[in-house]
Amino acid sequence: PGSVLEGIEQSLRRTRSEKIDVFYLHSCPADILQRGDLQDTLDRAVAAGKIGVAGYSGDNAPLAFAVDSGRFGAIETSVNIADQWNLRNVLGRRSEIGVIAKRPIANAPWRFAERPAGNYAELYWERLQALELDPFGMEWAELALRFTVHAPGVHTAITGTAKLDHLRRNIAAANCGPLPATVLERIDRAWRAVGADWPAST
C-alpha cells in the first residue's frame, strides 16, 4: 500500500497536477489483490481527490478477479486477433468499467516471413500461423485494429508508433467501423478450433 500511495504522489508531482484521472495497478497477482489492502489505499486516494478512478492493468485470472471485485472503474488488458482470452472470458462482465485494449495489432507479427525467434512478436506470430487466417482483402493492420477497437466491451485502444503516417493510417482503419459479420464469424471459427485454451499474453 505504501508504494502505491508513493506512486500516486510521484505522479502528481511529475505532472504538476492536483488529480490523476485514472491510476492503474499494473500486473498485480490475484493473491495480492485478494488481500484488498491495495484497493483500500486506492479508495482513500479517490476519497481524498488525488485520483478520479482506480484502474487495473493485467490479464487472465488476476484480471477476472479485479473485474469481479467491483473495486476498479477501469481496466487495461490485452485484446487482439491473436489474444482473445480476456475478450471472451472477462470483458462485458461489468458494463460500467472502462476498457482500454493494449497490443491491439498483436505486435504486428505479419512483418515476419519466418518465426521471429526472441522477438516480442514471436508468440503472436505462432498463433496467427495456427489460426490460418488471411486479412480478407485488407491490410493486416486494418483487420487487426478494426477487430480490437470495435470488439464488444472495448472503449479505446493503445497503439504505439514512431511514424505520423502510421498513426494516421491507424486512425483511418479504426474509422472504417466494425469488421463485416462474415469476417468475424471466420475469425471466431478459427479461434474456437485452435485457440480456445490460449491464455492472454502477459
Task: Please annotate each region the language model reported.
Residues H26-T202:
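Beta/alpha (TIM)-barrel catalytic core signal, keyed to glycine-rich beta->alpha loops juxtaposed to Asp/Glu
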Residues P1-G2, H26:
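Structural motif corresponding to the early beta-alpha repeats
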Residues G2-L12:
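Short, well-ordered amphipathic alpha-helical segments that serve as non-catalytic structural scaffolds
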